[in-house]
A protein has these predicted regions:
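Helix-to-loop transition at the C-terminal end of transmembrane segments
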Residues: 2-16
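Aromatic-enriched alpha-helical transmembrane segments of multi-pass intramembrane proteins
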Residues: 1, 20-181
Length: 183
């Protein structure tokens, strides 16, 4: 609706016919992504889901659930640990090494090689790590857990983008610490 109200235009000003907006809407309802430069990539930005940008995350979560149902759940704890270590290394290299070129792990929203690969790693590492934690979890008593969690979230959300200094991607290091340890 917002795309139609906004004039049905791509970023470069190209007018999009109503029938393409309707087709794109229907494809989005069925979680069928748009490939870059395809007819249903109506906003001209290369997004997987042009009418609902954040839906890329749900798309990768569905892929994760399919992989879980077919393969990951069958791994014993030792093999899952090996998978998590491999994914941690891949995730760290991608994030700290700034393979996306964005200076952030903000990838996965399009089908280009960097974004799709990055989106898969971005989903698979925390997903597999969460499974490993759930298998090995031993509850401990913490005083004031809500207060401590709230303070921690406020502190980490107040950290701005950390610019690179002499080819060291400080923002990537910060994001890797947040994803791996804090979250």
């Amino acid at each position: 609706v917002c795309f139609l109200i906004g004039g049905s235009q791509q970023w470069n000003g190209t007018q999009i016919p109503l029938y393409l907006s309707i087709i794109t809407f229907l494809l989005t309802c069925f979680m069928i992504p748009a490939l870059p430069n395809s007819f249903n990539e109506i906003r001209g930005n290369g997004e997987l889901f042009p009418l609902n940008g954040p839906m890329w995350s749900l798309f990768f979560e569905y892929i994760g659930n399919i992989l879980y149902a077919l393969f990951i759940r069958r791994l014993n704890t030792k093999r899952l640990t090996i998978v998590v270590i491999f994914l941690f290394i891949a995730h760290s290299i991608f994030t700290i090494g700034n393979l996306s070129g964005y200076g952030t792990i903000g990838v996965g929203w399009t089908f280009d090689s960097v974004n799709f690969f990055g989106g898969m790693i971005r989903m698979l590492f925390p997903f597999s790590l969460g499974m490993l934690i759930s298998r090995r979890f031993k509850a401990i008593k913490i005083s004031y857990p809500f207060l401590l969690s709230s303070i921690l979230l406020i502190v980490i959300f107040c950290v701005p983008y950390l610019a690179p200094i002499k080819d060291i991607n400080f923002n990537g290091i910060y994001e890797e610490i947040c994803i791996t340890i804090i979250f």
